[in-house]
From Swiss-Prot:
Origin organism lineage: Bacteria, Pseudomonadati, Myxococcota, Polyangia, Polyangiales
Protein name: Fluoride-specific ion channel FluC
Topology class, membrane: Multi-pass membrane protein
Pfam families xrefs: CRCB
Transmembrane segments: 4-24, 36-56, 100-120
Gene Ontology MF, one: metal ion binding
Subcellular location: Cell inner membrane
Family label: Belongs to the fluoride channel Fluc/FEX (TC 1.A.43) family.
Reaction equations catalysed: fluoride(in) = fluoride(out)
InterPro entries linked to this entry: FluC
Regulation of activity: Na(+) is not transported, but it plays an essential structural role and its presence is essential for fluoride channel function.
UniProt GO cellular component terms: plasma membrane
Amino acid sequence: MERWFWIGLGGAAGTLARYGLSTWCQQRFGAEFPYGTLAVNVIGSFLLGAIGEIAATTELLSPTLRLSLSTGVMGGFTTYSSFNNETIRLIEYKSWAAGLANIAITLVVCLLAGVLGMVVARRLIAG
């Protein structure tokens, strides 16, 4: 039951961080393109790549901490559902080009961010 508490607490923290970053991005860059969702998914992919690498190659993270960070914090921080909804809205109401760009940018950049997170974690671990 303790593990559930920490995962839930992590999820709440991730959700609040997502809301804060998304709001900031919308205020800074405008609402014409879902910059906030893109930012949280890229950052989350990087961090989840790093967390996964650290968990897989060291004993620095207990199983509860690993789940709290990955399932909790990163699960609350990243958002496929918002990406999906915003992409559909772009295509439906505004622009096929913007919607397809959102798909391509999100897939490629998030994948690269995840790999970069793993590489950075490996280098940090190696010292």
